[in-house]
């Protein structure tokens, strides 16, 4: 702000000149004092110039309504919503989220810098604040087979972009606590910036070493006990409520029962599909659910606003006070977080608006390259004694490493609706690598499901109760260049194409939402438990940095012991 602008805004703040916009008689939520005050809010040049009694050239009477800061999503992968970034931003704005701190490591894992450039371009100039954390682990771990590599040297030019805040979630905690050279380079590059974490089950001295490296946040806490350990180590816990990982209830109950201060807690969605956003809400849902669990409304709103702004050093966001950007949400109900209207930089966000999607290169639409596999390729030899298998977890993306005697014929695993077969196939560089493993608890019968959304390398994953359906699902994803597909009784039941890097649809959010709802319904009809989101659960089954057991293109991997159970060279 230059001297001339400051002088002009000061006159409005003092009431000597009318403000451009005044929101009258609002019940203003003050996140500093945690109180509600009936006040006018005056806006000039996109900033809040005063909270008190004001006159404006335009006035809006908000008697009986609440006015609070715009909500902030502390950590999300826009790609995980399945729609183009402008579509998602517009949809989430309707639920009061005005600031998005994104980690585009999905697109960077597929397409390297071209993927990052796509995301920066797609989020430029929108009616929201979109900040970027540069992906730290591409690939997630050294043995992963992905499409891009993002080194410290490649990151450095992006630091000049004012929307780049810091380093994205550091998943390779082994490299952090081992002080490995490439990781140390990245940590040094971001020494003056915030660094996001990803530290499931790190404890004691390992967690201390991780925090010592300057890693500030974590969104992988699934219970209160672990969240408390991270708080004790000076970290900010980003309470996640997404489509597959729903951690909020366990943590918020712990906060309430132990009367823990909420200053080191924020909210995030991480990975949330567009249909769940449209049905439940975005960060508004985190707030609403927390209030329903007994958290005081003003504390929940503060966690969604000021706490996050302070954590990420966003000094003009997160509060309704002079000098803050005029991003706010008008609520009809505090407990229900019922959004009446949303403002960004003092302008009311349009509900009905044509969304302009910038085109992407043809190269980003041709990223699925699968080998031609046969039923013979999918055979998995198993002993008569118990074998390692992946057991799915209800309502979480973690898995359990269990051992069981598997159904077999002629020494080979025969899948069924209880013991499914999962296949991961490399899709980026045509290596032909793939791996097969048994899965317990997914319970899919009469067919198969496949996806090219498979964190974080985004190879193609298929699961089913028979080889023929699995092979047909793989062929269908090759045909449409990525997406979700379902096979039932040897026929393609439904497909949601995601042709942009195998991650993002080029259709509107309503079409994606409709197809996704249909496909999730089909999956549950075919036996997938209601507590498991079929596509989210499948998309994380190949991520080797989340406990306990995973499958990669190199074989079955023990994520706790950090070693392969079965390695395929």
From Swiss-Prot:
Its cofactor is Mn(2+). Pfam families: Adenine_deam_C, Amidohydro_1. It comes from Desulfitobacterium hafniense (strain Y51). InterPro entries: Adenine_deam, Adenine_deam_C, Amidohydro-rel, Metal-dep_hydrolase_composite, Metal_Hydrolase. Keywords: Hydrolase, Manganese. Disulfide bonds: none annotated. One of its GO terms (molecular function) is adenine deaminase activity. One of its GO terms (biological process) is adenine catabolic process. Belongs to the metallo-dependent hydrolases superfamily. Adenine deaminase family. The gene is ade. This is Adenine deaminase. It comes from the Bacteria. NCBIfam families: ade. SUPFAM superfamilies: Composite domain of metallo-dependent hydrolases, Metallo-dependent hydrolases. HAMAP family: Adenine_deamin. It is an enzyme of class 3 (hydrolase). Its EC number is 3.5.4.2. It catalyses: adenine + H2O + H(+) = hypoxanthine + NH4(+).
């Amino acid at each position: 702000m230059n001297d001339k602008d400051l002088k002009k805004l000061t006159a409005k703040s003092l009431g000597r000149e009318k403000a451009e916009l005044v929101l009258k008689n609002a019940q203003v939520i003050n996140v500093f004092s945690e109180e509600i005050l009936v006040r006018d809010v005056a806006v000039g040049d996109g900033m809040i110039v005063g909270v008190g009694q004001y006159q404006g050239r335009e006035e809006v009477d908000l008697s009986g309504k609440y006015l609070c800061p715009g909500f902030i999503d502390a950590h999300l992968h826009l790609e995980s919503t399945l729609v183009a970034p402008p579509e998602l931003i517009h949809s989430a704005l309707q639920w009061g989220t005005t600031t998005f701190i994104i980690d585009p490591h999905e697109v960077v894992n597929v397409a390297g810098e071209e993927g990052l450039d796509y995301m920066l371009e797609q989020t430029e100039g929108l009616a929201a604040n979109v900040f970027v954390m540069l992906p730290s682990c591409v690939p997630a771990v050294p043995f992963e087979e992905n499409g891009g590599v993002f080194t410290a040297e490649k990151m450095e030019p992006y630091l000049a972009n004012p929307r780049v805040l810091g380093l994205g979630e550091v998943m390779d905690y082994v490299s952090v606590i081992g002080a490995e050279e490439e990781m140390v380079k990245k940590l040094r590059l971001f020494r003056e910036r915030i660094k996001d974490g990803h530290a499931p089950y790190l404890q004691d001295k390992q967690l201390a070493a991780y925090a010592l490296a300057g890693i500030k946040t974590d969104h992988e806490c699934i219970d209160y006990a672990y969240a408390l350990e991270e708080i004790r180590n000076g970290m900010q816990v980003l309470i996640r409520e997404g489509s597959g990982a729903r951690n909020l209830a366990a943590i918020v109950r712990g906060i309430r029962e132990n009367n823990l201060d909420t200053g080191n807690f924020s909210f995030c969605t991480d990975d949330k599909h567009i249909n769940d956003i449209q049905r439940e809400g975005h960060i508004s849902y985190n707030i609403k659910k927390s209030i329903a669990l007994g958290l005081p409304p003003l504390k929940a709103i503060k966690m969604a606003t000021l706490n996050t702004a302070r954590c990420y050093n966003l000094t003009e966001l997160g509060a309704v006070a002079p000098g803050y950007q005029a991003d706010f949400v008008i609520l009809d109900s505090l407990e229900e977080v019922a959004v009446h209207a949303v403002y960004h930089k003092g302008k009311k966000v349009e509900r009905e608006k044509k969304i302009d999607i910038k085109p992407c290169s043809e190269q980003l639409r041709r990223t699925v390259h699968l080998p031609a596999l046969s039923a013979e390729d999918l055979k998995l030899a198993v002993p008569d004694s118990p074998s390692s298998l992946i057991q799915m977890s209800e309502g979480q993306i973690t898995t359990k490493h269990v051992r069981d005697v598997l159904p077999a014929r002629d020494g080979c695993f025969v899948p069924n609706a209880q013991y499914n077969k999962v296949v991961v196939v490399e899709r980026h560089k045509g290596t032909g690598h793939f791996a097969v493993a048994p899965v317990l608890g997914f319970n899919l019968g009469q067919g198969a499901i496949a996806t090219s959304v498979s964190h974080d390398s985004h190879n193609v994953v298929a699961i089913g109760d028979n080889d023929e359906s699995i092979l047909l699902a793989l062929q269908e994803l090759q045909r449409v260049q990525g997406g979700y597909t379902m096979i039932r009784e040897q026929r393609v039941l439904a497909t949601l194409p995601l042709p942009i890097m195998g991650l993002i649809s080029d259709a509107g959010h309503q079409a994606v939402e409709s197809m996704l709802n249909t496909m999730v319904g089909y999956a549950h009809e075919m036996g997938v438990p209601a507590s498991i989101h079929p596509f989210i659960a499948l998309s994380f089954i190949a991520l080797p940095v989340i406990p306990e057991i995973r499958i990669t293109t190199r074989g079955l991997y023990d994520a706790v012991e950090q070693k392969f159970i079965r390695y395929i060279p």
